[in-house]
Amino acid sequence: MSPLKQFEIFPLIRLPEFFGWDINFTNSSLYMVLTVVFASLFLFAGVFRGKVIPGPMQSFVEIVCSFVLGIIKGSCGKAGSDYFPLILSVFLYVLFANLVGMLPLPMSFTVTSHIVVTLALAMVVFIFVTLIGLKKQGMGFFAMFLPDGTPNWIAPLMIFLEVCTYLFRPISLAIRLTANMIAGHTILKVIAGFVYPTSLLISPLSFLFVVVLIVFEVFIAMLQAYIFVMLTCVYLNDSLFKH
């Protein structure tokens, strides 16, 4: 089986077209729902019957929340704390989307392996931080496109380059996540495929290598969620403060 077959989208429930749009419930739709369900259950497990002396699950959820809050404060200071709910939601969605795709479930699918999903998420972040910048700084927000001390003769070129760089942010954010998920899952699938045809002597070593690779892929999944949120906070910092 092709290692790229795991990225194919196919309908699970066929629905009538909506003004010419295909709105079938696909394997991608299923795993998006599962991602939200798992992320919601994770948070619910942390707050359900919360105690002054937290149990293991409550402690773990609090550690994750504190970790995300630390990223926000490290990039944006206390002013960024107001946006903690959204940043936490983005972090958990990316994290669980990456991890759920690695579970041995039927029709296992990683939604973040498709650029349309990551680009949509990146556009939400991009529009959000842009609106925050316009609200906080007003017309002064556009000053970020012309660095202080820029000579007048080169100002038009600098503005053009800065605007292009700003508009490219969601694209780079989406491509980075998608490329890493595709590469990691493809390599894992290819190497795992070598375990079956190898001899009994080599198979245990191959299996051990696959286990190590899975652990590494889990690390990459968590790292990509961290990078996505870190860059989101960096962009938020640009919108909150004049530079």
From Swiss-Prot:
Membrane topology, as annotated: Multi-pass membrane protein
Annotated transmembrane regions: 28-48, 52-72, 83-103, 114-134, 141-161, 177-197, 200-220, 221-241
Gene Ontology MF term list: proton-transporting ATP synthase activity, rotational mechanism
Pfam families named in the record: ATP-synt_A (PF00119)
CDD domains xref list: ATP-synt_Fo_a_6
InterPro entries, A to Z: ATP_synth_F0_asu (IPR000568), ATP_synth_F0_asu_AS (IPR023011), ATP_synth_F0_asu_bact/mt (IPR045083), F0_ATP_A_sf (IPR035908)
Places the protein is found: Cell inner membrane
Keywords: ATP synthesis, Cell inner membrane, Cell membrane, CF(0), Hydrogen ion transport, Ion transport, Membrane, Transmembrane, Transmembrane helix, Transport
Residue ranges that the Swiss-Prot or TrEMBL entry lists as coiled coil: none
A GO CC term assigned to this protein in UniProt: proton-transporting ATP synthase complex
Homology family: Belongs to the ATPase A chain family.
HAMAP family: ATP_synth_a_bact
UniProt xrefs under PANTHER family: ATP SYNTHASE SUBUNIT A
Biological role: Key component of the proton channel; it plays a direct role in the translocation of protons across the membrane.
Binding partners and assembly: F-type ATPases have 2 components, CF(1) - the catalytic core - and CF(0) - the membrane proton channel. CF(1) has five subunits: alpha(3), beta(3), gamma(1), delta(1), epsilon(1). CF(0) has three main subunits: a(1), b(2) and c(9-12). The alpha and beta chains form an alternating ring which encloses part of the gamma chain. CF(1) is attached to CF(0) by a central stalk formed by the gamma and epsilon chains, while a peripheral stalk is formed by the delta and b chains.
Protein name: ATP synthase subunit a
